[in-house]
A protein has these predicted regions:
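Peripheral peptide segments
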Residues: 1-160
């Protein structure tokens, strides 16, 4: 399974790893947290400046977004992203989740027949509400699991 998260306008003010750079954004931090629960084989950030960005790559803050780019620039950006995906061994036929807006997905769609666009048709408020619900379900499941397995008697009863 592949997961691609888009970069965000809100960023750290200092050089850091890519997944840390965008954490000041509630949208990114919630998307990243939820995406990690899906246990992907590959997970990258789609960066307007850096194209395909491994989570641990160190980068400096920048101020550029694809929303300001022309259609031709977005198409060239996507071609470079696909080239980088190939060099990173991304399986284009694998189930793929995009946590990204239209500008980041429009020219990548054709490469991923088994894609799911997590933000499609939703406004920012809907996306945030949806992520809150998803993260709430994950938290509740984890809490229930911990209750069951943290009690020795419960574990023994479960095994028998």
């Amino acid at each position: 399974m592949n997961i691609f998260l888009s970069c965000t306008k809100e960023k750290e003010s200092k050089r850091c790893r890519a997944h840390e750079m965008y954490m000041p954004s509630s949208l990114f931090s919630k998307s990243y947290t939820y995406a990690k629960t899906l246990n992907p084989d590959k997970m990258y950030i789609l960066s307007a400046k850096h194209h395909l960005l491994p989570l641990s790559r160190e980068i400096a803050p920048y101020n550029y977004t694809l929303k300001d780019a022309s259609a031709e620039e977005r198409k060239e950006w996507a071609e470079e992203v696909v080239k980088q995906m190939k060099s990173h061994g991304v399986d284009f036929n694998a189930k793929t989740y995009f946590f990204a807006g239209e500008a980041y997905i429009e020219y990548l769609r054709e490469y991923f027949p088994n894609r799911k666009e997590m933000y499609a048709g939703k406004g920012i408020g809907e996306i945030m509400h949806w992520l809150d619900k998803k993260l709430g379900s994950v938290k509740e499941s984890l809490s229930n699991w911990l209750k069951i397995y943290s009690n020795k008697d419960s574990v023994e009863n479960y095994i028998e």
